[in-house]
C-alpha cells in the first residue's frame, strides 16, 4: 500500500480497485473452499493494516461512507473470531463499525443505537446453537423499539440459516464474512 502511494497511485483507487477487489477474491476463494479461516484472517489483517496506512490520505467520506454499523455477538456467546473477521470486512467495505464485543445483551445494543442514532445497520452474531434463542430475543427486543423502522438488522454465525433469519425477523443473513460485507452494502443502499 505504501509503495503504491509512493508511486503516486490514487488512495481511493488503491482501496477500491486493489484492496476491496482483492478481499472479494479472498471471499470467493473462502466460499469455494480454496482457502480456510486462517488464510482469511491473514488477508483481513493485511486489509486492516492497509486501511490504516490509507486513512490519512482518504477523505472522511470514503472511510465510513456507507454509514455506521453496530456489531455484536449476542448474550451468552463468547466467540469473536468470526465477528472480528466480519467487522474487518465490513469496515473495509466503507462502514464505520462500532464493535460491542461478545456476550452482549440486547439492552446494550439498544443503548448503543440510542447513542448513535445515525446507525444504519445492526449486525448480530451467534456461533452456538445454544445462543440462537439469545439472537432471537435480541432481534425481538430491537423490533419492539421505536427506531426499528430506521435500521436494518443482519444476522450470521455457524448455526444460523436464512430460514432462521426470516423466522426471527432479521432483514438479512450472511453465511460468511465476505457475503456479510456485500449484504451490508446492499442493506445500506436500500436505506439511501
Give the predicted meaning of each segment.
Residues 1-61:
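Long amphipathic alpha-helical segments
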Residues 20, 75-77, 103, 159:
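Short glycine-enriched loops at secondary-structure junctions
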Residues 26-27, 68-73, 125:
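Short, hydrophobic beta-strand segments
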Residues 40, 86-93, 98-170, 179-183:
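Cofactor-cradling patches in redox/metallo enzymes
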Residues 61-64, 145-147:
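Solvent-exposed alpha-helices and their adjacent loops that cap or buttress functional pockets
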Residues 64-100:
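Glycine-rich active-site/cofactor-binding loop and its immediate structural neighborhood
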Residues 181-192:
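A charged, well-structured terminal subsegment
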